[in-house]
Curated annotation (Swiss-Prot):
The keyword Cell cycle does not apply. GO terms for biological process: trans-translation. This is SsrA-binding protein. Keywords: Cytoplasm, RNA-binding. Residues 134-158 are annotated as: Disordered. Transmembrane segments: none annotated. Required for rescue of stalled ribosomes mediated by trans-translation. Binds to transfer-messenger RNA (tmRNA), required for stable association of tmRNA with ribosomes. tmRNA and SmpB together mimic tRNA shape, replacing the anticodon stem-loop with SmpB. tmRNA is encoded by the ssrA gene; the 2 termini fold to resemble tRNA(Ala) and it encodes a 'tag peptide', a short internal open reading frame. During trans-translation Ala-aminoacylated tmRNA acts like a tRNA, entering the A-site of stalled ribosomes, displacing the stalled mRNA. One of its GO terms (molecular function) is RNA binding. It comes from Allorhizobium ampelinum (strain ATCC BAA-846 / DSM 112012 / S4) (Agrobacterium vitis (strain S4)). It is found in: Cytoplasm. It holds the Pfam family SmpB. HAMAP family: SmpB (MF_00023). The gene is smpB. PANTHER family: SSRA-BINDING PROTEIN, TMRNA-BINDING COMPONENT OF TRANS-TRANSLATION TAGGING COMPLEX. Residues 137-149 have a biased composition (Basic and acidic residues).
Length: 158
């Protein structure tokens, strides 16, 4: 019989928003819990989620994850969840206030970076406070990435 701790998935990344780091300049990151139903957790454990087009929004005293897609759990019949429903994010009051100030006054955006399971087996969302990049900034990032690839190729051959 396996030890109890080995059955858990430690920091298993379920979904990652890879375009976020290209489209936004990441200022700060936060770890937030997600309020999920049972079938949503089971769907996440299967590794099925998409947060590519999702974003977070503040409404009142709460922060919500909007437009994230968690597909229905196939073994659940009539008690399934809606795949694109809004999900409440669990943050400290102090963190929520700090994020609201940054969004409203400084014109920043809340972008989800990845969904993963922590050591305790709880689903967490890595949320980034970000500023949108302009087109020339994106081109500059792409040029820098290409130059780094060329440098690594030259170092391997020479």
């Amino acid at each position: 019989m396996a030890p109890r701790g080995s059955q858990r998935t430690v920091n298993k990344i379920v979904a990652e928003n890879r375009k976020a780091r290209f489209n936004y300049e990441i200022i700060d990151t936060y770890e937030a819990g997600i309020m999920l139903t049972g079938t949503e957790v089971k769907s996440l454990r299967e590794g099925k989620a998409n947060i590519a087009e999702s974003y977070a929004s503040d409404e009142g005293e709460e922060i919500w994850l909007i437009n994230s897609h968690l597909p229905e759990y196939l073994q659940a019949n009539r008690f399934n969840h809606e795949p694109r429903r809004r999900r409440k994010l669990l943050l400290n009051k102090r963190e929520i206030n700090r994020l609201r100030v940054a969004i409203n006054r400084e014109g920043m955006t809340l972008v989800p970076l990845k969904i993963y399971f922590n050591e305790k087996g709880r689903a967490k969302l890595e949320l980034a406070l970000a500023k949108g990049k302009k087109l020339h900034d994106k081109r500059e990032t792409e040029k820098e990435r290409d130059w780094n690839r060329q440098k690594s190729r030259l170092l391997k051959t020479g």
